[in-house]
């Protein structure tokens, strides 16, 4: 498995597809994703030879160059692939239902993976709070985040509503 960052966010995307397909004989499985952050993510397979000379396919992930986008797409695409390759089940981040601690504005065109802190509420249920500004370049939004909220396309989602959260770290008690 190969993962690179930054190729998709500069002038190089024009070169990525022809290089993988024509020069390396690979296949691009997706080149843009309708999600936020991480839209310019690419996944491809490239034929190579294993150590014993047998033909195998190498997985290639091209992740966005913005730090928050790179970390989110690493967790959503690369980690599950590594888990699968190593036989770890279930693959990927664990998903749990959480209640929103406050209203969140939604993207009207793309699903969003919103950086958040999940903790145990007074009633014993899991509650999520945003880490703040969610721009792709906002590394600070990752500092305290222990989860990614899976938010639908829409206008807004209200305080107390339930969403799924992908856990990236430990949950703190009250």
Question: In which residue ranges do the predicted regions lie?
Answer:
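Glycine/threonine-rich flexible loop motifs
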Residues: 11-18
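Single conserved hydrophobic/aromatic residue that forms the stacking wall/gate
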Residues: 1-10
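Flexible glycine/proline-rich
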Residues: 19-174
